[in-house]
Amino acid sequence: MDMIEHKQVRDLKLKKNSQSDYTQIYIGLDFGTAFTKASYEIASQKHNISSVKFHDTEATDKYFMPSKLYFDDETKTLSMEKTSGALSEIKYFKYTMIDNSLAINENLYKYKDEVKNNLEQLCAMFFLSRVILKIKKAVTENPIIKNSKINSEVEWFINMGVPILETGEKSEIYKTVLTVAYQYAMKHPQGINANLVELDNFFEEKQGRCKS
């Protein structure tokens, strides 16, 4: 399994001080077929790796985010949660996003002519955007960050393991999806739902910049 990296500097102010520099955060993202896990390290705290807790529970599965979404056929909306029995489950997009022959989410494909981009990539982009927000929340709530005495911008490095070679078209798909997911998270930091067409428009706008 190879790694792809996304790097982005965000203006996240911590404590007011005359000093200003960067706090570097290294994120390890395991985008799994069934579950997603994440951990991070603050560069100034070497060998102190923290796992991201995705759920407010003491159960052992609090570190595992199910890699699935739910789709509302009527509103064409993706959701992180199943809010009604009418929503269909969307899963396995980690692999189907790079190979159309593996596509199994039939409810999505009724709308393939209404979007310009691969439907499974849109699912992965939205899912990863919500995961990134949960990771960033965990980082900013870390006492080391909260109690920092510097006025710092946070420089984020995300390493995501993918089941492909580091180079090639499929690697570029994962890189683009991860990068656009980060951008979408910053643009839309609230909510667990997203309209499929709106996601498509955002992805269409941003992916060209990723490739340029």
Feature map (PLM): residue ranges:
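Von Willebrand factor
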Residues: 1-15, 41-58
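Conserved phosphate-binding catalytic cores of ATP/NTP-utilizing and phosphoryl-transfer enzymes
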Residues: 2-24, 190-212
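Gly/Thr-rich phosphate-binding beta-strand-loop-beta motif of the actin/hexokinase/Hsp70
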Residues: 15-47, 87, 212
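An acidic- and aromatic-residue-enriched active-site/binding cleft used to recognize and process polar
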Residues: 31-34, 41, 74, 163-165, ...
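Short, well-ordered alpha-helical packing segments
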Residues: 37, 132, 175-179
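Phosphate-binding loop and its immediate beta->loop->alpha context
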Residues: 44-172
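Glycine-rich phosphate-binding loop and adjoining helix at the ATP-binding site
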Residues: 154, 166-211
